[in-house]
Amino acid sequence: LTYYTPEYKTKDTDILGAFRMTPQPGVPAEEAGAAVAAESSTGTWTTVWTDGLTSLDRYKGRCYDIEPVAGEENQYIVYVAYPLDLFEEGSVTNMFTSIVGNVFGFKALRALRLEDLRIPPAYSKTFQGPPHGIQVERDKLNKYGRPLLGCTIKPKLGLSAKNYGRAVYECLRGGLDFTKDDENVNSQPFMRWRDRFLFVAEALFKSQAETGEIKGHYLNATAGHCEEMMKRAIFARELGAPIVMHDYLTGGFTANTSLAHYCRDNGLLLHIHRAMHAVISRQKIHGMHFRVLAKGLRMSGGDHIHGGTVVGKLEGEREVTLGFVDLLRDDFIEKDRNRGIYFTQDWVSMPGVIPVASGGIHVWHMPALTEILGDESVPQFGGGTLGHPWGIAPGSVANPVAVETSVQLRNEGR
């Protein structure tokens, strides 16, 4: 049980993890907690001769606290400290491979969920983070003091590139700031990516010329391999598009970090979709909470990320959602267990990420969205724009009217 060290004082440079652990019946919590620390750091199933060739005391993970979960039988929050030297600098991939790579299939555990990570400045400073961040994005768009407005083009699959471009134009011309490729729009037989990019670029420039505003469409660069992804991002930049998009969980953290570096070097904003997150994050006792995936994304890089709505068709509890929204946007976030924040997180100077609210929302939700998420957010109305009873153009006019009214009423204290 050398990995269970309740007397250990955590260092400022340690990465700290909070796991929700359900041991198998008959397995003591201390033993299971030590197993989590061992398996996610230097341990293996037996003592090996080569242990003597290194300093395990320097490199091992330590389970330093175990607390029972109130109201749950045989469930514990286990705190583990990992020395900084266990992780490659600037690699979210390596961090997750170490911390959650193997331990979740461990026999001694019935279930295990990573609830939160504390990323020390000594580690976060090795990452570029978001390509631009909230303030630079607003400066690029010249839009301040209100949420930015988006719309996912529907039907998500089946439109030709020309008709897709027409829908983009109608939405942007009416008053939206952004339109969006759906996460599964890549390059299918009915609409190849290059055709889509060209027709969308035409819609962008036409709507910009007519409205005098800067417009964007999240061109999904996600592809089957990294070289193809980069080719699409480069083509988007050559067309003069201001923003591209990536599905960061299906595409992978390595691909995402490569794209984020390209975006910063070339002045592109990066919109991130979290497709597949619920596979990992939805179960309450096993997997990984979305706040951990959100922290990973902020380090890997993205200017927008879908973060739940609190009011639409997709699940999201208010306090917990606001907890990880703050972890995305703010510099310094205090520990607050009511909001699911297990550790105080200091991002130092890393740029923030704008949370995107999308999924079953429409203009009637705007006052609630403005109140809950504030100005630094992007509500996205796909069906709420394209499903307007009078047509797409009136739908896209309704959204800016709703947001301006909501912001004005809030600012006047009504």
Curated annotation (Swiss-Prot):
Mg(2+) binds at K180, D182, E183. It is an enzyme of class 4 (lyase). RuBisCO catalyzes two reactions: the carboxylation of D-ribulose 1,5-bisphosphate, the primary event in carbon dioxide fixation, as well as the oxidative fragmentation of the pentose substrate in the photorespiration process. Both reactions occur simultaneously and in competition at the same active site. The active site is at K154, H273. Belongs to the RuBisCO large chain family. Type I subfamily. Its cofactor is Mg(2+). The gene is rbcL. SUPFAM superfamilies: RuBisCo, C-terminal domain (SSF51649), RuBisCO, large subunit, small (N-terminal) domain (SSF54966). Binds 1 Mg(2+) ion per subunit. PANTHER family: RIBULOSE BISPHOSPHATE CARBOXYLASE, RIBULOSE BISPHOSPHATE CARBOXYLASE LARGE CHAIN. Keywords: Calvin cycle, Carbon dioxide fixation, Chloroplast, Disulfide bond, Lyase, Magnesium, Metal-binding, Monooxygenase, Oxidoreductase, Photorespiration, Photosynthesis, Plastid. The disulfide bond which can form in the large chain dimeric partners within the hexadecamer appears to be associated with oxidative stress and protein turnover. It holds the Pfam family RuBisCO_large_N. InterPro entries: RuBisCO (IPR033966), RuBisCo_large_chain_AS (IPR020878), RuBisCO_lsu_C (IPR000685), RuBisCO_lsu_C_sf (IPR036376), RuBisCO_lsu_fd_N (IPR017443), RuBisCO_lsu_N_sf (IPR036422). This is Ribulose bisphosphate carboxylase large chain. Heterohexadecamer of 8 large chains and 8 small chains; disulfide-linked. The disulfide link is formed within the large subunit homodimers. GO terms for cellular component: chloroplast. The record marks K313 as: Transition state stabilizer. The keyword Iron does not apply. The keyword Oxidoreductase applies.
